[in-house]
Each structure stands twice: as C-alpha cells, then as structure tokens.
C-alpha cells in the first residue's frame, strides 16, 4: 500500500491519520533515519490545527520508543523546520501540516538532516519498513535506551534572525506599508515580527488561530480579503501565506493578485541583476505559462521544467546547479536561504525588489503579459487511469490539433482532478475547458 503522496503523508485526521497509523509511520521513519543517525535527535513542528496535538503525541511516542530524543518546537512554518533541522544538527525534521487543506485534514512531512524533503526512493524505503511487522515489533527500546522528549519555545528567534539575514543589508522597509494575511496558520507569530523589525508599517489579518480556522476563507487560497485590505489601507504590498507558510500570494498596491509566473519571472531577473544566480537556469513546473519562458529568454535566462511539486523543483534545481525556482502556485525556492519553498523569504525578496525598482508594485511586478490560461480543480469520486477512459485520447489529439497546451493530472493530496489549458484564443480555451469538465464529470464523478 502506497502511503506517501506528492507532499508527504496527508489525510483526514482520525480517519486516515489515526494515532495507531501515525505511531506506526513514526516508528518506520525513525528506523529509516537510524540507519544514518549521527545525533539521535529529531525535530518536530506543526501548524495550528487542533489535530496537531494528537499527531504530535503519537509521533513522540513512536520515536522515543525506538530510542530517539525528540525536540518539540510548536507552531512554526514548514521552511522553519527545514532550516532548524540542519541548524540544530538533528537527524531529521518532521512537520505536521496539511498545508492549504481544511482544518479537518492533517499531514506529515519529513526532512533529512540537511533540511531537504525526502526523495521518492527514501519514501518507498519507509513504506517497506511500515509494512514489516517483525521489524517494527522488534525495535522497541527498554530502560535507559528509551528516548526523551523536550519542548523548546525560543527557537523562533533563530528563524527570525535567519529570515532577516536573507534581506539585503543596505535596505530597510521603513518606506513600505504592508498587509500580512497569515491564514490563522503557522506564520501568525513569525511574520509580523520580521516585517516590523525591518521597519515596515504592518497591518496583520487572520492571525488568531483557534485550531479550526486555519485557511478558512483566508490566506493564499482566498486572497480577496487581503486585496480589499490593501486598497483600504492604501498599502504598497500585501502578502498572503498558506497554513504552513511555504507558499506566498502577492497583492500589489492596486489590490491586484500577482500571477505566480510573473513573480517567478521578475524575481529571477532581479536575482540576475544582483549577480545572485548560481547559473543561467531557472526552474519551474510544467504548469508554467509559455510567456514566462519567452520573457526569461529575452533576459538571457533559460527555463528548466520539472514535475509539479516543490520537492521536484528542489531536485531539478540541484540537478541544474540553480539556486532559484518555483511553482506558479506560490511555492518559490531561494536555495541560498531555504531548502524548500519559504513564503517569508520570498515576501522579503519581493519587498526588496519593489524598493530597489523605485516603482509602484503594480508596475514593478508586471513585467510581461501572460497567454490565456484556464485552471480547474474538479472534485471527483474516483481516480481511474486517465488513459483507460473512453474518448480521452481523442480529446487530447483534438487539443493538440488546435494548439491548446494541456496538463491533466490527479491531485496527489486530494480527490481532485487538475485541468490546465493554455492557448492564444481565450474563447476557444473556455469552450474546450467546458467540454473537458463535462467529459470528466461523466467518467469520474
């Protein structure tokens, strides 16, 4: 049975993520990390979901039972776990979060000792241990060999200092008015402190988590409230994070939501202008707009494509010796400062770009026009092999004939089918998207 999806393990808390399941997974992961253990320490953080306590306690029980010493740091962004795992010399880091999903869901993401997400072969190795009853039941420690657990509440300061170091030393934010939407999630403590200490005039919204309101009509998936607040507050910029703050959505001074591909393009060129790129390659996923590739080419930069998922972006960056890349959804990686997508690092770089451009953000963050694109996330009941659906191949051939770029895939974390179409003719695009929706609703819903 496959346990891992595209971003760790995710599911409904108490349904898939039961205490017994989590304990078993924790033991399996711990035994895998033991093979390369240097410190016998594992770091655990979480977002603000109510079920995080249940999942955390199950993981602590599992890991201490096989001899690991566990450091619990409470609600922190996913990229903070990646950073602190390496910074505190731990064998591994674990983030308890379902990212942008509703509060009823939860998830578990693993990081190696260098702060990188696990590769697929590492996940498969953990799955093999998970299904090995004999190995699991023969691994418990007794007496003094049992591990301990301790909670540390002040590591937030380390991450804040790290974030501030990512911001250019010759700049400050005193001339910027910024609205932050922390999605009642993991960034609710960190984000306001970082921007305030760098001098910004800050307004914070959705920063009162109660365990059940994470991502609820707020944050990166619902930036309309942020857009309204930016206009009302006459702010220069607005930043919306998702539940675990590895994703960023930017709103300009006019209240417009900045497209992720425009963000990738303008940030890539900004990094080049500072001689901060390690290569001429910038990494993006197959969902990126063709206009991004053309824009980067005009700036003597090369776009490298990879599979969807920020861990695949990271792997492709390493392969191409690149230090900048991301997804149009807002997972953007500056690998000089973060091994995974970090919404706060990205927000600081956007702020620096706007400051140095001496332009309004609505101008500075709008470097090129996009080709018409349509993205639909279709709720489905079943995940059948797409190639097995009668008429599917003919549909794709027709799209190719009409020169409509297409990317159709199942979500790795939810019961959704993601359909992306791109073409120069917007009306044709809308027509074909409706046809595709009706086709898949008839076969998968």
Curated annotation (Swiss-Prot):
One cellular component term (GO) for this entry is: cytosol
Q: Which CDD domains match?
A: GlmM
Tell me the domain of life.
Bacteria
A single Gene Ontology MF term assigned here is: magnesium ion binding
List residues modified as Phosphoserine.
Answer: 99
Q: Which reaction does it catalyse?
A: alpha-D-glucosamine 1-phosphate = D-glucosamine 6-phosphate
Question: What residues sit in the active site?
Answer: 99 (phosphoserine intermediate)
Cofactor note text: Binds 1 Mg(2+) ion per subunit.
Q: Which UniProt keywords apply?
A: Isomerase, Magnesium, Metal-binding, Phosphoprotein
A Pfam family of this chain: PGM_PMM_II
Q: Does the keyword Magnesium apply?
A: yes
Q: What's its top-level EC category?
A: isomerase
EC number per UniProt: 5.4.2.10
Function per UniProt: Catalyzes the conversion of glucosamine-6-phosphate to glucosamine-1-phosphate.
NCBIfam families (alphabetical):
glmM (TIGR01455)
Q: Which family does it belong to?
A: Belongs to the phosphohexose mutase family.
Q: What is this protein's record name?
A: Phosphoglucosamine mutase
Which species is listed as the source?
A: Helicobacter acinonychis (strain Sheeba)
Give the encoding gene's name.
glmM
């Amino acid at each position: 049975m496959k346990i891992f999806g595209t971003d760790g393990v995710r599911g409904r808390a108490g349904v898939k993520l039961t205490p017994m399941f989590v304990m078993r997974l924790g033991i399996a992961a711990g035994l895998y990390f033991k093979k390369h253990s240097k410190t016998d320490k594992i770091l655990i953080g979480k977002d603000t979901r109510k079920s995080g306590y249940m999942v955390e306690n199950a993981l602590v029980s599992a890991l201490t039972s096989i001899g690991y010493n566990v450091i619990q740091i409470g609600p922190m962004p996913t990229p903070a776990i990646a950073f602190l795992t390496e910074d505190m010399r731990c064998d591994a880091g674990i983030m308890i979060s379902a990212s942008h999903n509703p509060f009823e869901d939860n998830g578990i993401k693993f990081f190696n000792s260098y702060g990188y997400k696990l590769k697929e072969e590492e996940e498969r190795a953990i799955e093999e241990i998970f299904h090995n009853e004999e190995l699991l039941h023969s691994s418990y420690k007794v007496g003094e060999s049992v591990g301990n657990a301790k909670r540390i509440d002040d590591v937030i300061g380390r991450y804040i200092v790290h974030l501030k170091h990512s911001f250019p030393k010759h700049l400050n934010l005193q001339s910027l008015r910024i609205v932050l939407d922390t999605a009642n999630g993991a960034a609710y403590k960190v984000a306001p402190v970082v921007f305030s200490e760098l001098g910004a005039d800050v307004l914070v919204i959705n920063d009162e988590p109660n365990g059940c309101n994470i991502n609820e009509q707020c944050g990166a998936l619902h930036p309309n409230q942020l857009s309204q607040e930016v206009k009302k507050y006459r702010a220069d910029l607005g930043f919306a994070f998702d539940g675990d703050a590895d994703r960023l959505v930017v709103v300009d001074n006019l209240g417009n939501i900045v497209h992720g591909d425009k963000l990738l393009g303008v940030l890539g060129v900004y990094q080049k202008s500072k001689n901060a790129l390690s290569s001429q390659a910038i990494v993006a996923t197959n969902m990126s707009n063709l206009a991004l590739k053309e824009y980067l080419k005009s700036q003597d930069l090369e776009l490298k494509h990879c599979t969807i998922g920020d861990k695949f972006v990271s792997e492709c960056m390493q392969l191409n010796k690149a230090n900048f890349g991301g997804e149009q959804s807002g997972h953007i990686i500056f690998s000089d400062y973060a091994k995974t997508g970090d919404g706060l690092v990205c927000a600081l770089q956007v702020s620096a770009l706007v400051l140095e451009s001496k332009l309004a953000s609505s101008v500075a963050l709008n470097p090129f026009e996009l080709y018409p694109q349509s993205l639909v996330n279709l709720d489905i009941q079943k995940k059948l092999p797409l190639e097995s659906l009668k008429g599917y191949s003919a549909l794709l051939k027709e799209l190719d004939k009409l020169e409509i770029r297409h990317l159709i895939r199942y979500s790795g974390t939810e019961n959704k089918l993601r359909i992306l179409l791109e073409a120069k003719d917007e009306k044709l695009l809308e027509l074909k998207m409706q046809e595709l929706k009706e086709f898949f609703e008839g076969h998968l819903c």
